Amino acid sequence: YKILLRERSWKVTEMEGIMSVEKQSFGTTKKGEAISLYTVTNKNGMVMKVTDFGAILVSVLVPDKNGVLTDVVLGYDHGEDYQVNTPHFGATIGRNGNRIENASFVLNGKMIQLTPNENGNNLHSGPDGFEFMMWEAETKEQAVAFRHHSPDGEQGFPGNFDVTVTYTLTDDNAVEIHYEGISDQDTVANMTNHSYFNLAGHD
């Protein structure tokens, strides 16, 4: 999964040559857990922000035609906002993205029942989807990896499922999202990112 946001020439020269990953407070969960925001900057001055709550892509800042950094991804300014609003801004969706009709399916001859949360169907794995969970974060050079252990039966899905979502900001101005998962049983794994883009930028 790769998002390419390229400019022919970069005008933000004061950050040129600097690559960094910074961590800061981003609020607390309803359980009182501390939420962190990770800001990744490449050598061209492009900025990507992600959070360990929901492994969410919060913002992507690129220079506009006047060289002013502009956010082209819709998101919130505080971690608490992601817990009370439901447009799924930037969220990591899983185990399953989209709808499962009647909130049930058959796997290996067994009926699997999920929680209905939209007109009798299961949308984005229900009210306890990956986007509402805290993820373990590991910072790397120009990247942040988020890990989650989804135990057997979580959201109703079978199998212990260990998943990693890695966000990378490259020096050719690409945001890359890499998914990796392993389960000890046959299960459903249909993950995605739910970002909304406004390429004109927003405040």
What are the functions of these language-model segments?
Residues 15-203:
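Surface-exposed acidic/polar loop and edge beta-strand patches at domain peripheries
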Residues 2-7:
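Extreme N-terminal basic, low-complexity initiation segments
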